[in-house]
Every structure is written in C-alpha cells, then in structure tokens.
Amino acid sequence: MAAHFVLNMQPHPIERFRRFLAGLYETAHLDALLVPLGSSDGTTIEPRIVDNAAELAAADPFAPVMILNSARPALDYQQAHPDRLLGVVMRACELRALTTLHERGAIDMDRIVAIGVDCMGTFGPDELAWRGSPQPLAEEALQFARQGGINPYRYRPACQMCIDPMPNNAAITVDLLGLPARKAIVISSSEQSARDFGLSNLTDGHASSDMVEQHERVRQQVNARRSRARERLLQALNGELAMDVDSLAAHLAECETCQTCLSVCPIFEQFVADLANVTRDETIQWIMACAGCGMCEAACVDHLPLARIINRVKATITEALAERMPANG
C-alpha cells in the first residue's frame, strides 16, 4: 500500500522543501545527500554531494535545469564510499540510469535512498545563462505544475520526447504534476518507507484522495502530450541522417577521437569493453538501456540530434523484437 502525505509549501515553497530535505537527512540517517545545489553566486545549479543538513540551504530540486545526469556522481560517490548511505534527489531519467547501474552491478541500491521528483522538463545551460539565475526557472516550474508545465517545445528535445516523467524505483516521490505546487505538494512512499523515514512527522498530514487522483490525471495528460511531441520530433528526422544500429555504431567509431557524447553518458561504460572498438551488440544493449536524459545530444560538438536518433533506433529495435515474438495461441 502506498502512503501519501501533503506538504504545505507556503509562504516560501523552496525554503519549505529544503526544510523537508533537512529533516529527511536526519530521520533517514544519511551520510550524504546528492541534490541539485545552487552556486555561491546564484548563477548556476548542478548536482552536488552535501554531508551535512546545513548545506541544503542552497538546494533547489525544482529548478528545471540539467547540466549532467546525476547518476554519474552517485556512482562516483559509492565507489569511493561503499559503506556509506547516500540519499539522492533525482529526476526520472536519472533514476532510470541509476537503476541500470544497479542492474549492471555497478551500484548497490541497498546503500541508496532515492527521492524522485516529478519532472516537467529541463533547460540546458544556454537558457540558464539567459535568465541569469535558476531561481526564476524554479518559481516558474512550480507556478505551472498544476497544468503539467509550460509548452514542451521550450525544453530540451530529450525532455520533449520523454513519455515517462514520473520517478520510478524511488523510496520517496515528490509529486508536483496537477497540484498547486506553490501551496501544497504530495510526498508519496510505501507504508514501510513512511514509517522508516518518519514522513508523518516531516509533513503536514495525509494527502486527500482528490490530490492523489488529480496528480494521476495530469500525469496521463502530460504523457499523451509528450507522445505527440515525440512523434513530431522523430518524423522531422526523416531523410536527415541514416538511423539504424549500424549507422549509429559507425558514427561512434568516427567519433573515437572526441567521444564527448559518450563520456557524459552515465551508463555507456557499463556496456562497452573497449571504447576504441564498440561492437554492434554492445551498441544495441546500450541503446535499449538508454535512460533518455539527452546529455549526449547536449554535449555533441557536431550538434547532431543524438537523443532523437537513439530514440528512433530504440523504437526500431523494439518493433523488430516484437515481430519475432510468437503470436499467442
């Protein structure tokens, strides 16, 4: 059974959520927490490790800015401190990458407390530079959470195509979609996790069924909207580039001297034995495990639409596998 709690966000939503995180840091007995953190000059934000609750005064998990997939620093931390308990505040695509790392034996999820935040989409560093600060972007995200966010075309292409913005495989979820997030949001977990982490003491009572149902309704609307955007973006690729496994593998081979797109992928190295000789089978496994974060496309110095290409190739592989499955009966 799921447990749903309301978190009243007034009068200062971001500060209120920081207090929730600080309380959770203590009740979960965390050794450290990986969370989006603003820079000292307030001009940028990126996932960073904090090892005391006081540092959460600069945390801002609602800023729709993605500089890197935080599954990578989570992996780095656990490799350096395998016995410590790490909390992570992540978006859906970051949690998907973290899950893949666990499945590949790279991360021990028993030493992770995952806090997943609804994602309405993210901007890259260019939008952040234009705004000058992540704070107005965070405030805008909360303002429009009730209707599922702003028009998706403003976000990075990978976010426009994401049809699963809900954080799965998280011990705790921060539910924003469909809710008046500047006033109140929902904190959800299993009943066991709620007891383990003392969520009833960190929140403001049980959430109403109306709030829970509204969140689910808007989630479905957002998924449908993203599906339409995905089809539009993939159709726009027609004739632009060869989009099959062999073409992508050949492209990766040509990029051997750069590999910037591969270095930012949090899971690529888990599938490839020799970076100088990526095989077709390794390429297929990597594509099928793609978390959809789009960091590869953001990093590509040739500005290739890699997230869209990978999305198309993944769909093609999935269709081919489905055709090989024997029909029931």
What are these regions (language model features)?
Residues 229-253, 260-329:
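Ferredoxin-type iron-sulfur electron-transfer modules in oxidoreductases and energy-metabolism complexes
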Residues 10-17, 258, 293, 306:
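Generic structural signal for well-ordered, non-membrane alpha-helical segments
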Residues 102-105, 255, 316:
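Alpha-helix boundary/capping residues
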